[in-house]
Amino acid sequence: MKKYIEFTKAYVKSMRFYYAFITGIAGWVGVSFYEYVTPIFYSDIQVIPSTEKKMIILFFLFLAWGINQIFNDYMGLPEDRINAPNRPMVTGELNAKAALAVSTVILTGVCFITYYYLEPIALIPLLAGILLNLAYEPAKAYGIWGNVVYGLSITSCTVFGFLACGPAAQPLFTKERISILFMVWLLNALMTYFSYFKDYEGDKIAGKRTIVVKYGIEKSKVFGVISAFFPSISFIAIYMSGCITVPLSTTFWILGVLTVFLQMWTACLYYVNPADKKTAYSLATNTRACVCGHAAFIGIYNDQLATLLFLVAYIFVGFLFDLHKNSNE
């Protein structure tokens, strides 16, 4: 019995729940959009999901990060032996094969429930997200492709959140929907860019030529400051082009400005401390900037929920990070 308890503790530790808000709130962007457009445009086809259904979707979205993280840890063992030597799978505290088996069983169950209880079509982004997650580690070896693949894997959560809610009217993809998906992709591609700084040494030795490894710390930290403006510039360009037609509330703009501040603060932290012991702890601000950006997008469709999620995400991302005192994990 003791070994099962120890395995469970190591498995949960490896799930790194402080990141779960990334997949959770990215997916809820899709749910919020579905609930917004259904009564206005598609009440004859689409159906507002029940509270029970939404809770299942939310549970799957938050679970998605941790379950898939087990596969990432296994595929990233060579660099993690340097970057994160105290992670359970690296130290042997977590049996890799058993952990992979557990994640596979859970994902199979999620697929089964999605097909038979949620919406069969939601299996498409679900399976796409799993495959993109598996492709992420190899993609890291090819510069910007790691960022591209990671961003797409999180964007699949947004698509899943939308399609899992209920019947979806055609067309599935419009310029407004694609614009929001692009912004979710961009936020996450930027987030993972900053995360590469803490992994510089291990990635370099393991042959993972991320952008930071390819161009070096000094050039990369300057690019980080420049790239922090990309999301806000992109959104303004998209909005001014008329791709987003929903009137934007004052609440959205306030959350948007706060998100821009978090993005700039993230860039400053990595510019000042790009590769030392403080770098790992800059991840909390980096993650907040990404997750709060997701919450701000929800503000386009539901500003009260967006405000709540923004505050909850900001508080609990920091709280969960603070529970992990060992930066080598």
Question: What do these predicted ranges mean?
Answer:
Residues M1-E329:
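Multi-pass alpha-helical membrane architecture of UbiA-family
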